[in-house]
């Protein structure tokens, strides 16, 4: 009986939910590709074009590897409180797909911030403390995207396909990790101005946000069980 249950045909709702997961996984590739990419300018661009001394102390570049984790710990309870506030509104919470879109938007704002710093600095070396603001945008993007993306898989994946759908989500992470180095080599190798490369990435992130907002209704129709309404 267990074998028969495992191999039974998927229902229409399950097929729709699988389609939604695959579609959102494509946006996940974009998010994580640009998220991983965000660290490389620190090592190869800002390492030479920023003043890393604060009060006579030279801040190690590696400290910024840990800054995101610290900001996640700080912002985690704050974002949880935000979700509660939104859910308590008369009109209810915003959809998970719009939240994922906002995660991409925060990432795009971070790259715009990168570009603004580079344009405004001219030939000067601005203080490395400015990078803290960039990491704030990076972390906000992660807090909007990562936990909710995992929750999306757990909530809407057919139970007997949960492992496979989790693998599909993981495959998106794998693709992003493989691609971001190539994107950096293409966009930041000197072929384009640093600020223009950052703005282009930001535009892609913003367009992804607009698309997620535009297809929000369609995605909700794919995952919603009419019998539960």
Question: Language-model features: where?
Answer:
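Transmembrane alpha-helical cores of Major Facilitator Superfamily
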Residues: 66, 70, 105, 136, ...
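Multi-pass alpha-helical transporter architecture, strongest
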Residues: 117, 200-229
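C-terminal transmembrane helical hairpin of 12-TM major facilitator-type secondary transporters
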Residues: 97-145
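A late C-terminal transmembrane helix in Major Facilitator Superfamily
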Residues: 154-188
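Intracellular juxtamembrane helix-capping segments at the cytosolic ends
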Residues: 143-158
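Intracellular loop-helix junctions on the cytosolic face of multi-pass helical membrane proteins
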Residues: 1-57, 79, 83-89, 215-229
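Transmembrane alpha-helices of Major Facilitator/SLC transporters
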Residues: 57-88, 103-111
């Amino acid at each position: 009986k267990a074998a028969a249950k495992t191999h039974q045909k998927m229902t229409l709702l399950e097929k729709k939910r699988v389609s939604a997961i695959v579609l959102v996984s494509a946006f996940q590739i974009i998010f994580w590709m640009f998220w991983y990419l965000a660290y490389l300018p620190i090592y190869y661009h800002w390492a030479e074009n920023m003043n890393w001394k604060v009060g006579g102390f030279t801040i190690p570049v590696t400290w910024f590897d840990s800054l995101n984790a610290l900001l996640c710990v700080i912002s985690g309870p704050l974002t949880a409180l935000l979700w509660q506030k939104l859910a308590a509104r008369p009109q209810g919470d915003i959809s998970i797909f719009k939240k994922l879109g906002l995660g991409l938007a925060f990432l795009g704002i971070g790259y715009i911030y990168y570009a603004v710093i580079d344009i405004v600095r001219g030939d000067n070396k601005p203080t490395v403390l400015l990078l803290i603001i960039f990491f704030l945008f990076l972390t906000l993007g992660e807090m909007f995207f990562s936990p909710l993306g995992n929750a999306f898989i757990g909530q809407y994946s057919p139970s007997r396909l949960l492992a496979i759908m989790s693998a599909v989500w993981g495959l998106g992470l794998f693709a992003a990790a493989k691609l971001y180095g190539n994107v950096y080599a293409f966009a930041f190798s000197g072929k384009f101005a640093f600020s223009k490369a950052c703005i282009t990435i930001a535009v892609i992130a913003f367009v992804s946000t607009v698309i997620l907002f535009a297809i929000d209704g369609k995605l909700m129709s794919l995952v919603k069980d009419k019998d539960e309404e």
